[in-house]
Amino acid sequence: DLYVSIIRKVKETVSIPVMIKMSKMVGNIPAVAHTLTVNGADGIVLFNRFYQPDIDINNMQIVSGNVFSNHSDLSDTLRWTAIVSGKIPGISIASSTGVHDWEDVIKCLLAGADAIQMCSAVYTHGAEIISQVLTCIEEWMHQAHYQSLDQFKGKLNYANISNPAMYERSQFMK
């Protein structure tokens, strides 16, 4: 497999951790994540955001669509972070796409993320959003009586909830 050979070559060349940023369009996300990590990836990033074209109807041109994620993009990130972290114990996951505020960060941690990327929020609001997010997380942790992230990381992942079907179901009708 091309990805496995690339991971192995990169790992032979560098001495830093190698995380693979995955697309949410792969057929079996947990299986692909497992394959990547057993073949050398130090973890995965969920998810890569695709270039999204748009059509300018006034100038009759293809143009760049919205390059930034939004809150509605977070649902897939939470779902798959929770499923993968629950099905593959010990996997390192960075949640990405749709993370815009401190509550989104906490949700990703509860789903099982080890790290969170919030690039669109930083581009939109500036780097100062990071300190604001950290302050709000600390306040929430204090109110919830948590002293460390490890106390709640993964608490609501696939393996730790009474009804895992909440993550499996993706259609309105069964």
Named regions from a protein language model:
Residues 55-70, 123-146:
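C-terminal helical cap(s) of enzyme catalytic domains, especially alpha/beta-barrels
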Residues 96-97, 125:
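Small/polar loops that bind or transfer phosphate-bearing groups
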Residues 98-99, 155:
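Gly/Ser/Thr-rich helix-start
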Residues 54, 107, 124-126, 130, ...:
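Residues in flexible loops and secondary-structure boundaries
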Residues 9, 35, 83, 128, ...:
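Alpha-helical scaffold segments in soluble metabolic enzymes
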Residues 1-94, 100-118, 162-170:
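Alpha/beta enzyme core
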Residues 74, 135-174:
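Extended, intrinsically disordered, low-complexity segments
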